[in-house]
């Protein structure tokens, strides 16, 4: 058994997930598609909780008549747990995900909390971005009031827990 297979088995035995993620990528030039794809793969490789990742960029196509170049990226990722894989998917939006191993996923309560927290934070960030881009000054004021009220409620809850 090779080192990678041994690492994969050990990681999966302790809650890890081996998955294939598929992404599309577009840019003005063929070279830029390749550079962006390489940078993207490198970014995933260095994310906390990624045990290893191996990516492949398909040959870019297109570019005719002022059209962008396009390619696909296949990225095999060994994540230390399901929450890490979930966070990668939420942050990077693959167009498809295939879990290769294990055949069944069991979440610890801590892992479920981590995943739900990441989902909530990601959704809140998207909502904030969209609302600040589309809202007028009056709507932004109401949004800021709501955020302050939520923060105050959070402070009250934290005080009760102490």
Give residue spans per PLM region:
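Long, contiguous binding/interaction regions
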Residues: 1-162
């Amino acid at each position: 058994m090779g080192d990678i297979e041994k690492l994969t088995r050990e990681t999966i035995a302790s809650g890890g997930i081996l998955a294939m993620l598929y992404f599309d990528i577009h840019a003005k030039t063929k070279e830029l598609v390749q550079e962006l794809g390489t940078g993207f793969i490198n970014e995933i490789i260095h994310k906390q909780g990624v045990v290893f990742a191996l990516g492949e960029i398909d040959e870019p196509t297109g570019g005719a008549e002022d059209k962008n170049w396009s390619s696909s990226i296949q990225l095999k990722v060994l994540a230390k747990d399901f929450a890490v894989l979930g966070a990668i998917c939420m942050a990077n939006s693959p167009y498809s995900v295939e879990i290769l191993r294990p055949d069944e996923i069991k979440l610890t309560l801590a892992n479920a909390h981590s995943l739900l927290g990441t989902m909530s934070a990601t959704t809140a960030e998207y909502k904030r971005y969209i609302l600040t881009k589309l809202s007028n000054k009056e709507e932004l004021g109401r949004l800021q009031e709501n955020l302050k009220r939520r923060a105050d409620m959070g402070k009250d809850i934290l005080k009760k827990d102490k």
